[in-house]
Amino acid sequence: LVAETQPKVRIRFSTSNPQDMSLDVLTVMQKYENICNYIHLPVQSGSNRILKKMNRQHTREEYMKLIDNIRRLIPKCGISHDMIAGFPSETDQDHQDTLGLMDYVKYDFGFMFAYSERPGTLAARKIEDDVPDPIKKKRLSQIIEKQQQHSQIRTKAFLGQTVCVLIEK
């Protein structure tokens, strides 16, 4: 409604949980030029096992389908993420699943962190932080390196183009 009644006002979603980013929302974003073609989707992990332990409300496959819908409806949409390396019980395979998801999406940029307990959270109360810090740091470094590669690819696609931007404080 705001996009329609205020066509000169640029609008941007700040963050959306993947399960809340419906086809209806994507269709509205596609329809109105004053809605920024940018979506922040905090996936956290590319492993279904870890997503379940995190109590996330989506699976890897649902997330990938959402990405496919975004790319189909809004081809030049920027997509960013949150990713956590070394969540309790994360295996090498879980980490490889995360790197594989990153290769599938090729995010424009992301917010990447090594897991650390936050007092009062379910994870702090119920899950032992059993991934050693050196492994967390190594995995985080791999995630950051991959993101830098993807950011460079995505940024180069805009060379020579004029685009409308939203500058925030």
Predicted regions span which residues?
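Internal alpha/beta loop-helix hairpins
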Residues: 111-116
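Short, electropositive alpha-helical surface patch
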Residues: 1-3, 23-37, 90-108, 130-138, ...
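Terminal RNA-binding accessory module
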Residues: 125-169
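A short acidic, helix-capping loop that chelates divalent metal ions and anchors anionic groups
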Residues: 48-53, 120-126
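Generic alpha-helical structural signal
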Residues: 64, 68, 96, 137-144
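Conserved SAM/AdoMet-binding glycine-rich loop
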Residues: 1-92
